[in-house]
């Protein structure tokens, strides 16, 4: 049986960064390098119905080992890594028996310090895997892949552990918001599933943001600066006025918990035309409606002031809070909580201040909460994971499978 850490290190050595500018699926051909390896590993584990489609979605099924009906459940992770930092030539460091000191990340000059990352102080005695300070690690979400496959290997090696059908799925392009777009829920054939894509040990999430993209387009008039008086309209000045109308404290860096925000994420600026790219987030549908109305109101106010419709607002919904689709199936959450408790883990139920494949899948008819991986600081060079936490994730996956069978006997 492949060791959990060995699997993980193998996966992070493969660059699978996704590309939001590419329209195809997967957005980068290199995601197939990991996808094809996972197909081989699923076949080595002798799973049934192993497949990969033209879009890079990998699926397989561990058949039930009991002689009574048990609902099929699934475990899902994504193969791509975030565009925010390089995923090429990842060089992990293993820190055994961490003692609370500063961790030097290779020769990059970067460090993991308890003062900046206080979670480290809760991990004394743990074995950590870090980056070398030049790339992300890829624990998001290759740790989830390693944990799922290791759990499957445990179930295969221990046939005395009862379980129903276990469906496994690995998706491309989650980091650019498309991971569930072409996921074949009918083919997957699970009653419900769990993404293994969370952070610290104990995390259990079934609420996420409602998400909208807001593009503000400001139109100006470009004239030679030497003859511009009374003629030029600088669209960048209009854009600046609009941004100043946004609530200064309702930003990602100023909010937490269930608080929503407006986030100016990008800007393409010129005198004649400036485009502001916002993402807007709120946990309630009502709150999101109010945020959309607020932005439209500010556009209207600015247009009235400018005496011409120089500002446009284009709103596009991205995903919705899965809570409304998961709560009607309380057993899905209760099973995960029961499994964690049986593994001496205190469930830490909190909202996801983001989105997951599970959010989209829940609205596609597959209730799909999110479970921890044991990782921290995703999407950047300070990403790290605890080997202890990874092993606990494996234990929880195995226990969910076991309890699902025993509870339905």
Swiss-Prot record:
GO BP term (any one): proteolysis
Active site per UniProt: 80, 174
Pfam family, one: Peptidase_M20
EC number: 3.4.11.4
Compartments it resides in: Cytoplasm
Cofactor note: Binds 2 Zn(2+) ions per subunit.
Keyword 4Fe-4S carried by entry: no
Binding site for Zn(2+) 2: 140, 175, 379
Cofactors required: Zn(2+)
InterPro entries: ArgE/DapE_CS (IPR001261), Bact_exopeptidase_dim_dom (IPR036264), Peptidase_M20 (IPR002933), Peptidase_M20_dimer (IPR011650), Peptidase_M20B (IPR010161)
Cited PROSITE patterns: ARGE_DAPE_CPG2_1, ARGE_DAPE_CPG2_2
Catalytic reaction(s) noted: Release of the N-terminal residue from a tripeptide
Major localisation: cytoplasm
UniProt-annotated binding residues for Zn(2+) 1: 78, 140, 197
HAMAP family reported in the protein's UniProt record: Aminopeptidase_M20 (MF_00550)
Function: Cleaves the N-terminal amino acid of tripeptides.
This protein's name: Peptidase T
Organism: Aliivibrio fischeri (strain ATCC 700601 / ES114)
């Amino acid at each position: 049986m492949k060791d959990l850490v060995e699997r993980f290190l193998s996966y992070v050595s493969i660059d699978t960064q996704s590309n939001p500018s590419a329209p195809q699926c997967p957005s980068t051909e290199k995601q197939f390098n990991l996808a094809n390896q996972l197909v081989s590993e699923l076949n080595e584990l002798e799973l049934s119905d192993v497949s990969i489609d033209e879009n890079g979605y990998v699926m397989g099924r561990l058949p039930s080992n009991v002689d009574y009906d048990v609902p099929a459940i699934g475990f899902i992770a994504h193969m791509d890594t975030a565009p925010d930092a390089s995923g090429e030539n990842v060089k992990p460091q293993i820190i055994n028996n961490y003692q609370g000191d500063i961790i030097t990340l290779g020769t990059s000059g970067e460090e993991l310090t308890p003062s900046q990352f206080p979670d480290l102080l809760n991990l004394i005695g743990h074995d950590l895997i870090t980056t070398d300070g030049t790339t992300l690690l890829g624990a998001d979400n290759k740790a989830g892949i390693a944990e799922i496959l290791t759990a499957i290997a445990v179930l295969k090696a221990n046939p005395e552990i009862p379980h129903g059908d276990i469906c496994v799925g690995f998706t491309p392009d989650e980091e650019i918001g498309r991971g569930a777009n072409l996921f074949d829920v009918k083919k997957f054939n699970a009653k419900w599933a769990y993404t293994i894509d969370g952070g610290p040990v104990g995390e259990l999430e079934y609420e996420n943001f409602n998400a909208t993209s807001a593009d503000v387009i400001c139109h100006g008039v470009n004239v030679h600066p030497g003859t511009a008086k009374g003629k030029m309209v600088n669209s960048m000045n209009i854009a600046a006025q609009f941004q100043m109308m946004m609530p200064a404290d309702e930003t990602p860096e100023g909010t937490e918990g269930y608080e929503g925000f407006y986030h100016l994420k990008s800007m393409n600026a010129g005198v004649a035309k400036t485009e502001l790219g916002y993402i807007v987030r709120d946990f309630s549908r009502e709150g999101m409606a109010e945020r959309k109305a607020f932005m439209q109101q500010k556009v209207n106010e600015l247009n009235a002031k400018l005496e011409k419709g120089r500002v446009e607002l284009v709103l596009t919904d991205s995903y919705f809070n899965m809570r409304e689709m998961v709560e009607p199936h309380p057993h899905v959450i209760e099973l995960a909580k029961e499994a964690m408790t049986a593994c001496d883990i205190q469930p830490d139920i909190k909202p996801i201040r983001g989105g997951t494949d599970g959010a989209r899948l829940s609205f596609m008819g597959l209730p799909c909460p999110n479970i921890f991986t044991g990782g921290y600081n995703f999407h950047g060079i300070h990403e790290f994971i605890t080997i202890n936490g990874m092993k606990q994730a494996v234990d929880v996956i195995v226990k969910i499978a076991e309890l699902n069978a025993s509870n339905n006997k």
